[in-house]
């Protein structure tokens, strides 16, 4: 593992990557409840712990973000392979899927399969199989029977689920970007074994020694995760001369829609109606003296 990188880098003369005000508005500085903290993250946490949750020092957060941004940009400029990983929940899966496709890099949003990196040869076999099946379906669809087409489509769908995001990988990635290194511990562990640099959003419960480029941040709230992961994707976009979404934009142009939790409708059971319905279903007539079935 390389040494922890916490020193800010020299930035260009252009506008700041993102303002402290916007970081605060998106609650990127709000960590986890104090009892979950990892003492090794203490360097990034406000010393005056006045809140129920630990809070990150915003200036340190911005410096770390700029350092990570510059490194991601450098890797992309050198045609390095970058892999985004986010499997924690439906929101993160959709987010990672969208941003990776936006900047045309590999991604994994389904369950991390053991050996994805450490046994890359086996992964390559699955990727080659998927690519050949897609090619076969495109070229020979008219010559296949309806049943053969259906079976082929099902096999492609199964492989796409796990390998669709990495089918462009021709070699091991040069950089791994994860939204939560605690949840994605298997991916981080494999990257560490192979000495692949890791960029990660590290909450207060993270062991920073496992991550090369730490971004101390709230990775449990959608608006924070969305802002920071998109900024890392913008580093790739800038390197490829593609449009960026949030990087170096004024605050008023950074709009993030916060998803609302949809509560399941309450089912109110009317016991009287329930008994009545049950009686009707069983075709039962109640008599004070005897219970008979009509």
UniProtKB/Swiss-Prot annotation:
Name of this protein: Small ribosomal subunit protein uS2
GO molecular function: structural constituent of ribosome
Keyword Aminoacyl-tRNA synthetase: no
GO annotations of cellular component type: cytosolic small ribosomal subunit
Gene that encodes it: rpsB
GO BP terms, alphabetized: translation
Keywords: Ribonucleoprotein, Ribosomal protein
UniProt key word Ribosomal protein: yes
Pfam families with a match to the protein in the record: Ribosomal_S2
Taxonomic lineage of the native organism: Bacteria, Bacillati, Mycoplasmatota, Mycoplasmoidales, Mycoplasmoidaceae
PROSITE patterns in the record: RIBOSOMAL_S2_2 (PS00963)
Tree of life domain: Bacteria
Family recorded in the similarity comment: Belongs to the universal ribosomal protein uS2 family.
Organism: Mycoplasma pneumoniae (strain ATCC 29342 / M129 / Subtype 1)
């Amino acid at each position: 593992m390389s040494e922890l990188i916490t020193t800010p880098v020299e930035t260009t003369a252009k506008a700041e990557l993102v303002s402290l005000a916007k970081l605060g508005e998106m609650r990127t500085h709000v960590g986890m409840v104090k009892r979950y903290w990892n003492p090794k993250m203490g360097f990034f946490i406000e010393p005056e712990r006045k809140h129920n949750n630990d809070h990150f020092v915003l200036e340190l957060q911005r410096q770390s973000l700029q350092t990570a941004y510059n490194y991601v940009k450098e890797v992309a400029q050198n045609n390095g392979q970058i892999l985004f990983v986010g499997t924690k929940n439906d929101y993160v899966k959709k987010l990672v899927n969208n941003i990776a496709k936006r900047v045309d890099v590999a991604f994994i949003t389904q369950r991390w399969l053991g050996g994805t990196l450490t046994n890359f040869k086996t992964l390559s076999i699955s990727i080659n199989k998927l690519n050949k099946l897609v090619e076969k379906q495109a070229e020979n669809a008219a010559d296949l029977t309806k049943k053969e087409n259906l079976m082929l489509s099902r096999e492609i769908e199964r492989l796409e689920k796990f390998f669709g995001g990495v089918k462009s990988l021709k070699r091991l990635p040069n950089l791994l970007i994860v939204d939560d290194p605690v949840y994605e511990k298997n991916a981080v562990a494999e990257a560490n074994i192979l000495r692949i640099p890791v960029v990660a959003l590290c909450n207060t419960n993270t062991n920073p020694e496992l991550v090369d480029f730490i971004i101390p941040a709230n990775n449990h709230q959608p608006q924070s995760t969305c802002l920071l992961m998109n900024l890392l994707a913008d580093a790739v976009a800038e390197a490829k001369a593609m449009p960026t979404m949030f990087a170096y934009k004024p605050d008023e142009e950074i709009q993030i829609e916060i998803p609302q939790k949809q509560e399941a409708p309450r089912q109110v059971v009317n016991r009287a109606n329930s008994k009545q319905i049950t009686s009707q279903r069983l075709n039962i007539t109640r008599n004070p003296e005897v219970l008979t079935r009509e």
